[in-house]
C-alpha cells in the first residue's frame, strides 16, 4: 500500500444543497487526511480546461455548463491508496447504480448531478491537484 493524494470536488448540485460538510465528514470518517480545501466558482472556460480529456464525449458541453453553474468545493485528500479507495467511497457515476452508503447513492440525483468528482488515476491526480492548488496551499 502506498500513501497517495487525490483531488475530490463537491459539485454544484451538492453545494447548492449544503452537503459539503456531510461529504467531508464522510471521507474523514474513512481515515483520510484533508490536506487542502477551497470553495470557488469555475468559469465555463475553466471547466472546459479542467475536463479537456472529455472534450470529444457527447456530455462535455453539458458537464462544463453544469460545473460552472455554481460554487464547488475542491479538496485534496491523503491516505493509503487514496485514489482507488475514495473512488469506492464516491460510488458509481450513476447514483442509481451506486452501492448503498456511497456518496453518490446518498447525495447524487442523476448521472450528471452526482454530487462529487474524484481523480481516477495517479496520472489524473497529478494533473488535477495543481489545477486547483499551489504547493503552498497543500498542508503536509
UniProtKB/Swiss-Prot annotation:
Molecular function via GO: ATP binding; metal ion binding; nucleoside diphosphate kinase activity
Organism taxonomic ancestry: Bacteria, Pseudomonadati, Aquificota, Aquificia, Aquificales
Protein name: Nucleoside diphosphate kinase
InterPro entries assigned: NDK-like_dom (IPR034907), NDK-like_dom_sf (IPR036850), Nucleoside_diP_kinase (IPR001564), Nucleoside_diP_kinase_AS (IPR023005)
Cofactor(s) listed: Mg(2+)
Catalytic activity: a 2'-deoxyribonucleoside 5'-diphosphate + ATP = a 2'-deoxyribonucleoside 5'-triphosphate + ADP; a ribonucleoside 5'-diphosphate + ATP = a ribonucleoside 5'-triphosphate + ADP
EC number: 2.7.4.6
SUPFAM superfamilies the UniProt entry points to: Nucleoside diphosphate kinase, NDK
Broad class of enzyme this protein falls into: transferase
Gene that encodes the chain: ndk
UniProt organism field: Persephonella marina (strain DSM 14350 / EX-H1)
Amino acid at each position: 500500500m502506498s500513501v497517495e493524494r487525490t483531488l475530490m470536488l463537491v459539485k454544484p448540485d451538492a453545494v447548492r444543497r449544503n452537503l459539503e460538510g456531510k461529504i467531508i465528514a464522510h471521507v474523514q470518517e474513512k481515515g483520510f487526511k484533508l490536506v487542502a480545501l477551497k470553495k470557488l466558482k469555475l468559469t465555463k472556460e475553466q471547466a472546459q480546461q479542467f475536463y479537456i480529456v472529455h472534450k470529444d464525449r457527447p456530455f462535455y458541453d453539458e458537464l462544463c455548463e453544469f460545473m460552472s453553474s455554481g460554487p464547488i468545493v475542491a479538496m485534496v485528500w491523503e491516505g493509503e491508496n487514496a485514489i482507488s479507495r475514495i473512488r469506492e467511497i464516491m460510488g458509481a457515476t450513476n447514483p442509481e447504480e451506486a452501492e448503498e452508503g456511497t456518496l453518490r447513492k446518498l447525495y447524487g440525483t442523476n448521472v450528471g448531478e452526482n454530487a462529487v468528482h474524484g481523480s481516477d488515476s495517479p496520472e489524473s491526480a497529478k494533473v488535477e491537484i495543481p489545477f486547483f492548488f499551489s504547493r503552498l496551499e497543500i498542508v503536509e
